[in-house]
C-alpha cells in the first residue's frame, strides 16, 4: 500500500513541478529532493511490503513513510490552491502570501529530513531481512460472505452436492417445515451449493415463494424479518416486531415456500426460534441454513440426517474451475503444456478450495501467458502458503493483493469501509477513485475510462462479486466476498486507510449506526462516504456540519441516501472551507430543494452528483464556473426544469446525466452548448417539448466524436407530433457504442436508427413509449446489418416484431432482455408480456 500511496504522490509531484514552476520558485529543489528520494525508495517497496509482515521495525518504518507521503500530498494541494486562487507568484511580496511561503518552506524542510532518515532505514533493513522472505506468514481473520447471485460458469464439481439437496427438498411433506443444513469451512462452496439449488428452474416451479436471507455476524431479529418481507415484495415495512411476523405469516400462509438463511454465525439462535414459530407449517415448505458451525445448524432445528458437508474439489475439478477463470478468453481451455504443468502446481496449492482457486485464477488471467512469469508466481505462492487450511486461503488472497498494480491496491482497499453484505454501487466506487486520484490517467485516456478499467481489473481477479449486471454486460452493483473483505480490512487498518484509529484514519464509511464521535475525531479524512445498505438512510445532524471545517484535506464527500435534520444551507454552512474537495455526492438526499450557495468556492470539484433529488428545482449559475468538472449528474430530478447558462464552459466534462435543455426564449443552457464539450463520453438527454431543440441545433451531437453512450429520454413529453419531428432530425455521432431510447413518443422508430447511420453500435435499449413498429431503415439491406451484441426491449406494449427478423438483421447478437412487451412474436423468452427474462446465445451449438 505504501507503493500505491507513493505512486500517486509521485505522479502529482511531476505534474506540479511541470505546471506550477512559478509557484514553486524557491522550493523547487526541496520538492525535487522529495521526488528523488521517493523514486529511489519505490524500487524497494515490493519486497518491503512482504517483509513488513514479519518485521515490526520495518512495518513501523513504512507506516511512518506513508504518513509523510500524505503530508507531501497535502503540501502539494496547498501549493496548487494558492496558485489557482490568486494567480500570483509565491515568491512575491504580498503580505498574505509571506506567511504561506514561510510555512511551506518549514514543512518541506521537516519532511525532507524525515524522508532521508526513513530511506536510510529501509535500505539498511532490506539487506539483512531479505532472507526472511522464505519464512512463513500467517494471516488470521474469520471470513464472512453472502450473496444470492452466482455465475454458473464458475460452478464446477458441485453436481453431487446440489443433487443431494434437491433430493431432500423433494422429500418434504405436509407434516412440517423441512430444515436442511450445509456446513463447512469458509470458501468451501456452501453458499454456491445453496445458490445453485435456489436458482434451479424446477425449484422455481416447485416453490411458490423463494426467499434468500443473508445473515451477517451483526444483525437484529427485525432486520431478518424485514429482509424476508422485502423478498416477498412488501416495501411498506413498519417498526412493530409483532406486526412484521404477522405479515410474514399472512404472505406465506397456504403456500409452499423455500427460505435460505445464508452464512449464519451466531450460536444464540433464539431469534430464529421466534421467527420459526411464526411461520405457517406444512405445505411441503423447506429451510436451508448455511453455516461454518455445525452446532448452529443443530440449534436451528436441523437433524443430523439432513446436514450436508461439501468436500474440497478433486484435482480434476480444481483444474477445470481454474481454467474457466484463468483462461476465460480461450473458453476455459489451456493450450500450453508448459503452462498446464506449472498451472496445476499453482492449483494444488489451493487445496481444492473453490474461493482460493477462483481468486488465483483471476490473478493469472491478468498475467502474461509465459512460463517464467507463472513459474515465479508458483514459487512465491508456495512460500506464502501454510499448513493451516484457513490461513492457506488468506495467503492465497494476500498473494492476489501483493500482485496487484499499485493503483489497484488503493481501489481494492476502498472496499474496506463498506459494511458486511453491503451491495456496492459501481458508480459510487469509480467516482470516489477519480475524486481521490487513485486512478492513473495516461496515454490520452480519460479519468472515467481509466476508473472503469480499474473496476474491471478487480472483477477479473475475482476480488469483487457481481450482484447485478446491466443488459450491456456492465456491472451495476457488486459485493465483497467475506474472505476478501476480512483480508482487505486488515490491510486497510495496517495502512491507516481505514480502521479504528481515528487519529490516522483517512477514509470512513457513513452508516446508520455510526457514532458522531467517529466522524468528528477523524481529522485526517480524505474521504467520507455514505455506505448505507439498500433501503436504509443516514440521518445527518447539524453538529457534524459544524465540523466540516476541520476536515481540511477532505477530497471526497458522499452524503447520498441521507436525511438532513436541519436545512442543508445550515448543515453545509462551512463546506466552503473544504478547498480541496473534488467529489461531492448529494444524490437521493432529503430534503434538497436547492444547492447551497456555500459550494460556490469549491472550484476544485471534478464530480457533482445531485441525482434522485426529486425536490431540486434549479442549479445555481456558479456550477457552470466549475471548469474542472468531469461528471455532472442531475438525473431523476423531477422538479429540475433546465440547467443554467454556461454549460459550454465545462470543457472537461466527460459524463453529463439528466441534461434538460432550456426552452425557447427561456433562461438556461440550450442543446447547442453540447458542441463545446469535446471530451463528452456519456450523455443522458431529457427532452419533453419541441421548442427545446431548434432546427439549427439538431446536429449538436454529430461533432461529439468521443461520445460512446447516449440516452434520449422523453418521459412526460408534450406536443408529441412536433417533438417527434425534431427527434427525426437528431444526428447521433457515427461512432456511438451504446444507445438507449426511453419513452420515445413516436409509433415508428426514427429513421436514423439504422445500421448505416450507427455502424459502431453494440448495445441498443428501447424502453417505454408508443413504439409500434421499427422503420424500414432499421432492417438495413443485403449489404448492411447491425453489429449489435446486446438488445433490451422493455415495456413496449404495442411493438410487434418477429424474432427471426431480429436474428437476421443482428447476426452478432449475444444477449436479449425482453419484458412487458406482449406483441413480440416467437421470442425465445417465456413471459415476454410480463416479467420476461433473458436469452443468451448458446455458443456450444
Model-predicted regions and their roles:
Residues 114-188, 192-208, 214-217, 227, ...:
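N-terminal flanking helix/linker immediately upstream of nucleotide/cofactor-binding cores
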Residues 9, 45, 56, 149, ...:
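Leucine-rich repeat
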Residues 75, 80-90, 96-98, 103, ...:
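Surface-exposed helical/coil interface segments that assemble multiprotein signaling complexes
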Residues 43-144:
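Charged, amphipathic alpha-helical interaction modules
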Residues 1-57, 646:
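N-terminal amphipathic alpha-helical segments
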Residues 255-258, 282-288:
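Loop/turn-to-beta-strand initiation segments
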Residues 39-55, 228-240, 246, 283-285, ...:
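Non-catalytic, charged helical/coil tracts that couple and regulate nucleotide-powered enzyme cores
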Amino acid at each position: 500500500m505504501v507503493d500505491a500511496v507513493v505512486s500517486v504522490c509521485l505522479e502529482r509531484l511531476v505534474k506540479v513541478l511541470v505546471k506550477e514552476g512559478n509557484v514553486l520558485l524557491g522550493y523547487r529543489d526541496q520538492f525535487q529532493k522529495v521526488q528523488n528520494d521517493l523514486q529511489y525508495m519505490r524500487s524497494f517497496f515490493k519486497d518491503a511490503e512482504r517483509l513488513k509482515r514479519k518485521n515490526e521495525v520495518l512495518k513501523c518504518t513504512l507506516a511512518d513513510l506513508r504518513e509523510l507521503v500524505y503530508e507531501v500530498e497535502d503540501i502539494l494541494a496547498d501549493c496548487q490552491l494558492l496558485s489557482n486562487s490568486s494567480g500570483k507568484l509565491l515568491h512575491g511580496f504580498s503580505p498574505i502570501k509571506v506567511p504561506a511561503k514561510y510555512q511551506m518552506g518549514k514543512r518541506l524542510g521537516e519532511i525532507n529530513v524525515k524522508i532521508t532518515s526513513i530511506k536510510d532505514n529501509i535500505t539498511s533493513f532490506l539487506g539483512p531481512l531479505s532472507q526472511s522472505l522464505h519464512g512463513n506468514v500467517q494471516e488470521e481473520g474469520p471470513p464472512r460472505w453472502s450473496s444470492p447471485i452466482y455465475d454458473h460458469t464458475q460452478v464446477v464439481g458441485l453436481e453431487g452436492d446440489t443433487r443431494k439437496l434437491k433430493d431432500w427438498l423433494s422429500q418434504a411433506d405436509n407434516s412440517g417445515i423441512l430444515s436442511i443444513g450445509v456446513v463447512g469451512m469458509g470458501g468451501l462452496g456452501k453458499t454456491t451449493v445453496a445458490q445453485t439449488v435456489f436458482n434451479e428452474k424446477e425449484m422455481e416451479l416447485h416453490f411458490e415463494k423463494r426467499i434468500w436471507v443473508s445473515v451477517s455476524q451483526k444483525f437484529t431479529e427485525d432486520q431478518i424479518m424485514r429482509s424476508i418481507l422485502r423478498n416477498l415484495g412488501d416495501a411498506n415495512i413498519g417498526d412493530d416486531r409483532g406486526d412484521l411476523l404477522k405479515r410474514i405469516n399472512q404472505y406465506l400462509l397456504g403456500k409452499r415456500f423455500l427460505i435460505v438463511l445464508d452464512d449464519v454465525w451466531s450460536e444464540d439462535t433464539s431469534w430464529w426460534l421466534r421467527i420459526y414459530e411464526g411461520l405457517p407449517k406444512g405445505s411441503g415448505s423447506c429451510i436451508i441454513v448455511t453455516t461454518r458451525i455445525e452446532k448452529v445448524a443443530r440449534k436451528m432445528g436441523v437433524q443430523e440426517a439432513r446436514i450436508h458437508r461439501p468436500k474440497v474439489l478433486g484435482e480434476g475439478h480444481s483444474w477445470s474451475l481454474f481454467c474457466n477463470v484463468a483462461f476465460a478468453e480461450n473458453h476455459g481451455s489451456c493450450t500450453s503444456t508448459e503452462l498446464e504443468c506449472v498451472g496445476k502446481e499453482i492449483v494444488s496449492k489451493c487445496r481444492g478450495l473453490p474461493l482460493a482457486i477462483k481468486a488465483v485464477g483471476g490473478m493469472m488471467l491478468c498475467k502474461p501467458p509465459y512460463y517464467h512469469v507463472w513459474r515465479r508466481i508458483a514459487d512465491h505462492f508456495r512460500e506464502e502458503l501454510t499448513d493451516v487450511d484457513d490461513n492457506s486461503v488468506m495467503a492465497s488472497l494476500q498473494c492476489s493483493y501483493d500482485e496487484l498494480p499499485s493503483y489497484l491496491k488503493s481501489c481494492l482497499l476502498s472496499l474496506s469501509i463498506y459494511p458486511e453484505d453491503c451491495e456496492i454501487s459501481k458508480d459510487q466506487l469509480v467516482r470516489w477513485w477519480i475524486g481521490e486520484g487513485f486512478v492513473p490517467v495516461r496515454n490520452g485516456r480519460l479519468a472515467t475510462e481509466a476508473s472503469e478499467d480499474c473496476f474491471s481489473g478487480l472483477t477479473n481477479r475475482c476480488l469483487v462479486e457481481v450482484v447485478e449486471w446491466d443488459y450491456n454486460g456492465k456491472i451495476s452493483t457488486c459485493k465483497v466476498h467475506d474472505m476478501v473483505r476480512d483480508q482487505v480490512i486488515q490491510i486497510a487498518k495496517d495502512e491507516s486507510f481505514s480502521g479504528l484509529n481515528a487519529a490516522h484514519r483517512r477514509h470512513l464509511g457513513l452508516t446508520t449506526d455510526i457514532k458522531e464521535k467517529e466522524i468528528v475525531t477523524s481529522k485526517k479524512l480524505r474521504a467520507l462516504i455514505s455506505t448505507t445498505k439498500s433501503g436504509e438512510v443516514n440521518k445527518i445532524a447539524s453538529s457534524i456540519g459544524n465540523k466540516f471545517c476541520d476536515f481540511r484535506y477532505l477530497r471526497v464527500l458522499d452524503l447520498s441516501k441521507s436525511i438532513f435534520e436541519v436545512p442543508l444551507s445550515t448543515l453545509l454552512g462551512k463546506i466552503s472551507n473544504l478547498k480541496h474537495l473534488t467529489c461531492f455526492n448529494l444524490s437521493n438526499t432529503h430534503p434538497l430543494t436547492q444547492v447551497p450557495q456555500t459550494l460556490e468556492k469549491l472550484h476544485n470539484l471534478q464530480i457533482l452528483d445531485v441525482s434522485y433529488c426529486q425536490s431540486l428545482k434549479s442549479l445555481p449559475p456558479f456550477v457552470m464556473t466549475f471548469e474542472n468538472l468531469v461528471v455532472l449528474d442531475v438525473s431523476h430530478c423531477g422538479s429540475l426544469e433546465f440547467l443554467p447558462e454556461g454549460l459550454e464552459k465545462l470543457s472537461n466534462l466527460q459524463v453529463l446525466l439528466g441534461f434538460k435543455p432550456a426552452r425557447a426564449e427561456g433562461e438556461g443552457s440550450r442543446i447547442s452548448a453540447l458542441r463545446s464539450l469535446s471530451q463528452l463520453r456519456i450523455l443522458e438527454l431529457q427532452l419533453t417539448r419541441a421548442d427545446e431543440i431548434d432546427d439549427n441545433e439538431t446536429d449538436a451531437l454529430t461533432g461529439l466524436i468521443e461520445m460512446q453512450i447516449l440516452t434520449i429520454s422523453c418521459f412526460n413529453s408534450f406536443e408529441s407530433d412536433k417533438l417527434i419531428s425534431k427527434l427525426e432530425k437528431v444526428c447521433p455521432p457515427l461512432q456511438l457504442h451504446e444507445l438507449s431510447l426511453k419513452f420515445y413518443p413516436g409509433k415508428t422508430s426514427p429513421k436514423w436508427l439504422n445500421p448505416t447511420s450507427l455502424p459502431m453500435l453494440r448495445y441498443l435499449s428501447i424502453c417505454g413509449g408508443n413504439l409500434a413498429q421499427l422503420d424500414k431503415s432499421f432492417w438495413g439491406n443485403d449489404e448492411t446489418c447491425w453489429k449489435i451484441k446486446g438488445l433490451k426491449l422493455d415495456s413496449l406494449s404495442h411493438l410487434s416484431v418477429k424474432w427471426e427478423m431480429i436474428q437476421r438483421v443482428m447476426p452478432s447478437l449475444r444477449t436479449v432482455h425482453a419484458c412487458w412487451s406482449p406483441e413480440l412474436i416467437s421470442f425465445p423468452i417465456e413471459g415476454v408480456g410480463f416479467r420476461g427474462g433473458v436469452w443468451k446465445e448458446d455458443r456450444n451449438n
